[in-house]
Amino acid sequence: MDKQNSQMNASHPETNLPVGYPPQYPPTAFQGPPGYSGYPGPQVSYPPPPAGHSGPGPAGFPVPNQPVYNQPVYNQPVGAAGVPWMPAPQPPLNCPPGLEYLSQIDQILIHQQIELLEVLTGFETNNKYEIKNSFGQRVYFAAEDTDCCTRNCCGPSRPFTLRIIDNMGQEVITLERPLRCSSCCCPCCLQEIEIQAPPGVPIGYVIQTWHPCLPKFTIQNEKREDVLKISGPCVVCSCCGDVDFEIKSLDEQCVVGKISKHWTGILREAFTDADNFGIQFPLDLDVKMKAVMIGACFLIDFMFFESTGSQEQKSGVW
């Protein structure tokens, strides 16, 4: 054995390589023939195989037809502000088109965009909102569709159509609010909003319930059957804190979620009506009812937080 090793070393004394082995690899790289089982992977000085290498490379290097990891799984479209869209999940059974996103989330964040023209001139423009999940991914984009005269003459009590689109630009939810009385002292013509998904197909309603002290609402399904209740605080003031509207069972004994108006800072609260909201609901809640909760949030926004400055609805007592 010693004699054989000495013969092998004599062939390439400067590299200590076996007889017949090409000496193109550096001395420190020799760990045995490439691909030979029982030898460790490549060392620091071992050069990687060239691009398109088809043979069995050293251990630790990817082989052909093997997936490359740490790459994005979804080709997500990116919005104007660089916000990624939420990947579309597998639609559950009997799910209206476009509502499959709601099947996998239990929290929604709604951010109203600041309109510079409205801030500088007080001229009321169409409201626009970003609807995101808890990871900051955009789920929907919502835009109000009303004429100039209606917005500036009727103010927060105005009727409106609010269209909610998905990442493909398809309108998946439509909110219809008729013109109603905004005073709690007049119980004959209270606020309501209709939620449609897809557009033209009602899936639920949010109906204001008269109460002398508290803002209350009833959530109804497409058959006008009561499903849930919403109860807000007596003082709908957002000064330095959030305002919570609790989502309750029909007997109002169990709280199942909430709609929160988030405090956005003294300057934004004082000079704009661009508000931030959060909606929390059970993960297993029907996607139609989750969409109805979005409609309830927009109705609450227009009723209590659309006015600016020290106007009554912004910091009043219900």
Curated annotation (Swiss-Prot):
Biological process according to GO: acute-phase response; apoptotic process; defense response to virus; negative regulation of phagocytosis; negative regulation of viral genome replication; phosphatidylserine biosynthetic process; phosphatidylserine exposure on apoptotic cell surface; plasma membrane phospholipid scrambling
Extracellular side: 306-318
Superkingdom as given in the UniProt entry: Eukaryota
Function of the protein: Catalyzes calcium-induced ATP-independent rapid bidirectional and non-specific movement of phospholipids (lipid scrambling or lipid flip-flop) between the inner and outer leaflet of the plasma membrane resulting in collapse of the phospholipid asymmetry which leads to phosphatidylserine externalization on the cell surface. Mediates calcium-dependent phosphatidylserine externalization and apoptosis in neurons via its association with TRPC5. (Microbial infection) Acts as an attachment receptor for HCV.
Known outcome of mutating residue 273 to A: Reduces the Ca(2+)-dependent phospholipid scrambling
Annotated thermal dependence: Optimum temperature is 37 degrees Celsius for nuclease activity. Activity reduced significantly beyond 45 degrees Celsius.
Sequence ranges on the Cytoplasmic membrane side: 1-288
Name of the protein in its database record: Phospholipid scramblase 1
Residues bearing PTM Phosphothreonine: 161
Motif SH3-binding 1 positions after renumbering to this chain: 18-26
Subunit structure: Forms homooligomers in the presence of calcium. Interacts with ABL. Interacts with RELT, RELL1 and RELL2. Interacts with OXSR1 in the presence of RELT. Interacts with TOP2A and TOP2B. Interacts with OCLN. Interacts with TRPC5. Interacts with TRPC1 and TRPC4. Interacts with ILDR1.
Sites of Phosphotyrosine modification: 69, 74
Induction: (Microbial infection) Induced by IFNB1/IFN-beta in response to a viral infection.
Lineage of the species this protein comes from: Eukaryota, Metazoa, Chordata, Craniata, Vertebrata
Effect after changing residue 279 to A: Reduces the Ca(2+)-dependent phospholipid scrambling
Motif (SH3-binding 2): 42-50
Motif Nuclear localization signal, residue numbers: 257-266
Free-text note regarding domains: The N-terminal proline-rich domain (PRD) is required for phospholipid scramblase activity. The transmembrane domain is essential for membrane insertion, phospholipid scramblase activity and proper calcium-binding.
GO MF term list: calcium ion binding; CD4 receptor binding; DNA binding; DNA-binding transcription activator activity, RNA polymerase II-specific; enzyme binding; epidermal growth factor receptor binding; lead ion binding; magnesium ion binding
UniProt main location, coarse: membrane
Cofactor note (record): Magnesium. Can also use zinc with lower efficiency.
